[in-house]
Swiss-Prot record:
This is Ornithine carbamoyltransferase. Carbamoyl phosphate binds at residues 57-60, 84, 108, 135-138, 269-270, 297. GO terms for cellular component: cytoplasm. Belongs to the aspartate/ornithine carbamoyltransferase superfamily. OTCase family. It comes from Bacillus cereus (strain ZK / E33L). Its EC number is 2.1.3.3. SUPFAM superfamilies: Aspartate/ornithine carbamoyltransferase. Reversibly catalyzes the transfer of the carbamoyl group from carbamoyl phosphate (CP) to the N(epsilon) atom of ornithine (ORN) to produce L-citrulline. The gene is argF. It is found in: Cytoplasm. It catalyses: carbamoyl phosphate + L-ornithine = L-citrulline + phosphate + H(+). The lineage of its organism: Bacteria, Bacillati, Bacillota, Bacilli, Bacillales.
């Protein structure tokens, strides 16, 4: 640990990327890259992270559990359905009880308000592993992936095409924070949340970022350095068959990517539905970096865990 300092964060929790400054985000990314190259740093020896899941997960569960093991700690899986919280115990009581037993909480659930209450009532760090509104850990990994590719955010254009969902929301805040140009193209009626867009635009004024919300996918990806998409059907929306027809012009395919820079890179938070939001030709092609991106979930989250846990040990 002689070469890279543990980032000092001015927050107990990570619920959205609003809580981090540009400097903190860059420090986390640099620390994550260090940890990527030094996987077995036992920086959280003996620490326990509770992992509460109300939604299915592959990447979030495995990356947090593996990350805690690599850092010398332990990840404890807690099914939301099996906890007393699933049978009527309040979020507040759950937060206070867990604070007596473990050192931190990661929660992946539906209601963002529940995560906010959990953080408010707990004395230990709480990390949002995904809600219906935000996915900050994914956005941190996305920023890390972009930074590894081009070593800057200034002058870089990220195009997000598809549903204006939780991933889109966190990317908007992330891009605004680091001063990156981000365009979003969605069908009418599927734009990102208006309040989150307003927050991103306000942050962008301070950082020099550009944020554009469009409905034309070709315009959105024009001269883009990175093209990003997500599934058209988020968890809980399966069966909305009419969305498939509406979203078809927003598929990432060889015709659409012709409008991007020739050197563009393709991003996807996964899981992917090939031949729906993206063709196999693109996601499995040479300009796709989706698996490197998925791998960076592990490293970005490790950096976040160490930073938040150390903040509790050494409050400013």
């Amino acid at each position: 640990m002689s070469t890279v300092q543990v980032p000092k964060l001015n927050t107990k929790d990570l619920l959205t990327l609003e809580e981090l400054t540009q400097e903190e985000i860059i420090s986390l990314i640099e620390f994550a890259i260090y940890l990527k190259n030094n996987k077995q740093e036992p920086l959280l020896q003996g620490k326990i992270l509770g992992l509460i899941f109300d939604k299915h997960s592959t990447r979030t569960r495995v990356s947090f559990e593996a990350g805690m093991v690599q850092l010398g700690g332990h990840g404890m899986f807690l099914s939301g359905k099996e906890m007393q919280m699933g049978r009527g115990e309040t979020v507040s009581d759950t937060a206070k009880v867990l604070s007596q037993y473990i050192d931190g909480i990661m929660i992946r659930t539906f209601s963002h308000a529940d995560v906010e209450e959990l953080a408010k009532e707990s004395s230990i760090p709480v990390i949002n592993g995904l809600t219906d509104d935000h996915h900050p850990c994914q956005a941190l990994a996305d920023l890390m992936t972009i930074y590894e590719e081009v070593n800057t955010f200034k002058g870089i254009k990220l195009a997000y095409v598809g549903d204006g969902n939780n991933v889109c929301h966190s990317l908007l805040l992330a891009s605004a924070k680091v001063g990156m140009h981000m365009t979003v193209a969605t069908p009418i009626g599927y734009e990102p949340n208006e309040e989150i867009v307003k927050k991103a635009l306000a942050i962008a004024k301070e950082t020099g970022a550009e944020i554009e919300i469009l409905h034309n996918p070709e315009l959105a990806v024009n001269e883009a350095d990175f093209i990003y998409t997500d599934v058209w059907m988020s968890m809980g929306q399966e069966g909305e068959e009419e969305k498939y027809t509406l979203f078809q012009p927003y598929q990432i395919n060889k015709e659409l990517v012709k409008h991007a820079k020739q050197t563009y890179r393709f991003l996807h938070c996964l899981p992917a539905h090939r031949e729906e939001e993206v063709t196999g030709e693109i996601i499995d092609g040479p300009q796709s970096i989706v698996f490197e991106q998925a791998g960076n979930r592990l490293h970005a989250q490790k950096a976040l865990l160490v930073s938040l846990f150390k903040n509790v040990e050494e409050p400013s």
